Amino acid sequence: MKLTIALSKGRIFEETLPLLAAAGIVPAENPESSRKLIIGTNHPDVQLVIVRASDVPTYVQYGAADLGIAGRDVLIEHGGAGLYQPLDLNIAKCKMMVAVQEGFDYDAAVRRGARLKIATKYPQIAREHFAKKGVHVDIIKLYGSMELAPLVGLADAIVDLVSTGGTLRANKLAAVEHIIDISSRLVVNQAALKLKYDAIQPVLDAFAGAVPA
């Protein structure tokens, strides 16, 4: 019974390797250097598919992958339909923040009821956050270089992931509001969990035992 695990390249993959090892799964190739999108492992019945981070939940939802690892940010934007989320893996940690150009008085703008333009890759998270605060916003969906938006007058603020804050500082932006903590989660196709329980559950147990504190 073949198991397919959806992963994305980069930080999440690197921090997933010890968890895979705990489950006895070792990739046959390094996806960072391989052009292959389907990578075998030391188990003939386990394969990895390498996809964009934002596509991991979709591959799992529709059964193209049985399991996947995705950031909480991606899962919120996706909506989580058809997914079982049994485990917070405590990897790839960062924070979702509101950031503005240095010198912009965000609190004053909020207090006076200004309608703010918000640039973000995460419209669902941003919309929910500002709705809870009762702040009127126009969401501008971007796919990269969020930090540029306030500098050229496209937006008053951005909603983005912040790890060290170095990129914000380099572009004279400052984080002004914390929205949520982000880490990566293990997600499982709900139908696959029933049909392939004997194959999937040992992987879940091994991951649970290896999650960093």
UniProtKB/Swiss-Prot annotation:
Keyword Transferase applies: yes
InterPro entries, A to Z: ATP_PRibTrfase_cat, ATP_PRibTrfase_CS, ATP_PRibTrfase_HisG, ATP_PRibTrfase_HisG_short
Alphabetical list of HAMAP family matching this protein: HisG_Short (MF_01018)
Biological process per Gene Ontology, one example term: L-histidine biosynthetic process
Assembly information from the UniProt record: Heteromultimer composed of HisG and HisZ subunits.
Disulfide bond entries: none
PROSITE patterns: ATP_P_PHORIBOSYLTR
The keyword tRNA-binding appears for this protein: no
Enzyme Commission number(s) of this protein: 2.4.2.17
One of the record's GO molecular function terms: ATP phosphoribosyltransferase activity
Taxon lineage: Bacteria, Pseudomonadati, Pseudomonadota, Betaproteobacteria, Neisseriales
Protein name listed in UniProt: ATP phosphoribosyltransferase
